[in-house]
Amino acid sequence: MTAMTRTLSRIGLILFVVGFLSPLLMRKAGGEELWPLARQQRDVHRFSTLFLAQDIRDSLSNPSGIEKALLWCKKTGVTKVYIEEYRDGYQAKREAILRVKDRFLAEGFEVAGCVTTTKVGKPSTGWKDYISCYTDLKTQEKIRVIFEYAAGLFDEVMIDDFWFTDCACGKCDAARKARTVRIGNKSHPVPGDTWSDYRSELMVQLSREYVLGAARRVNPRVRLIIKYPQWYDQFHERGYEIVRQTSDFDRIWVGTETRDYDDKEWGGTVQYEGFFIMRWLGGAGAEKCGGGWYDWLGTTEKTYIEQARQTILGGARESMLFCYGGLQRETGPGNVEVLRGHIPELLKVAAEVKSRKLIGIAAYKPPNSEPGEEAKVFDFVGMMGLPLVPCHEFPAEAQAAFFSIHALKDPGLAEKLSRFIQSGKPVLITDGLASRLAGKVGLDRPNVIQLKVNSAPPSLLKLSGSEIDPLRASLLRPFKLEFLAPNRTALYLFDDGSWVVENFSNQPIEARLNGETISIAPRAWVCRWKQGEN
């Protein structure tokens, strides 16, 4: 019997399966009983929501609307609300904002502000219905005014994930070629002449001067939060520069809205991405990383709950339920009703995750790295039951590692990877990266496994369990683990021997972990936590 097998068998483990919650938990989630539980647990994990500027104008414009929102929040276990000052060209009125703010504070909620930088000034040549040209000096001034207004109302302000630009107008193109960013009357050099170079420098400098600087001049106490979108492979192309912006802002937030993979409008993202991006940005942001943010768009009740699970397994300290108004329509009410029934368990899982260190196969994505033909490959590899530990720095000390085309961003990759391979540790490398490293790194060693992505990461979902099992056998050897399961099954490992297995398929499955059979219902998870030694 291995050490891990003994660990899994040891008395003191707690087993519970989502989808088979106890009647007690379900009763507790039925009404306002959720509110005291959520308040008690908010230092472990809190649920929050956002009132759009338009919600303040419309549904929260009178006392009855505010009371309705209060009741909804309490029934949903929400203990913090964000009140938006600006969105889509509309700035909410000061009196209306303060009326909502004061009422929620009086009821014991935490309250913060929010800004969504859509339809500001000159439109972009790209997503022109929402995104702006920030080379335009008048548009920059409008940004300054918006954030001065928000900072005058709140000590904490989040920026929704439209804080980017995709403009390629004549002025932007000329500035890109000149390798110069101008913010007001100040000029800043740009290190290169690509659109990524220009837009990243533009958004970094604009944030420093007209977001952070402007807000702090009005309110020295204000904390600014930048929310990153879930499309992590394109951040730098549109001006999100996670190294400098994470350093500059007081906190960061993470978009974990994966939605339904098969949805015709919103689909194409597998559920595991919520976990991957939460952990990847959590590593880059460390204590600055506040939480995740997901919505109802393109979801079913099952995918909505999966977004919640992945956010919490990703180590988030807060789950933003976007947004109050949206959750009153379409799939929102059904999603929320199901979420309420799961919140007690989600809070318990959050407490267990918080007290442990994630372990597994290091998955290296350097900041600002290009995916080539392997976009989102990490998400699909995670769906194969390979327990990933996302990282933004080369994982020299990892026990096993996965490398994709993204790793080429690291100028020292060839030397670092050669040393890692020579150490004898298991390495999984994509065929795309292997072809680019031919003649530079010795890959013909028994500890190196090549993953055939064939320039189509979604094709990995078609691999059978029997095709994946040999990969797992090699890569999990340092952890003294054997894991057998179908595709669309995720494994999460912790340093004390605890684990979670989640079934993303629509059929019940049986997985085997070190000889133990684990039966998992469709779209459910099994969590096993080792007690007493944390």
Show the residue positions of the predicted features.
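Coiled-coil-like amphipathic alpha-helices with heptad-repeat character
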Residues: 1, 5, 22-23, 75
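Bacterial N-terminal signal peptides that target proteins for export
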Residues: 2-14
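Bacterial N-terminal signal peptides
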Residues: 11-24
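Signal peptide processing junction and immediate N-terminal pro/mature segment
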Residues: 24-32
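Glycan-processing catalytic domains of CAZymes
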Residues: 32-415, 421-422, 431-439, 444-462
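A conserved amphipathic helix/loop scaffold
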Residues: 382, 392, 404-534
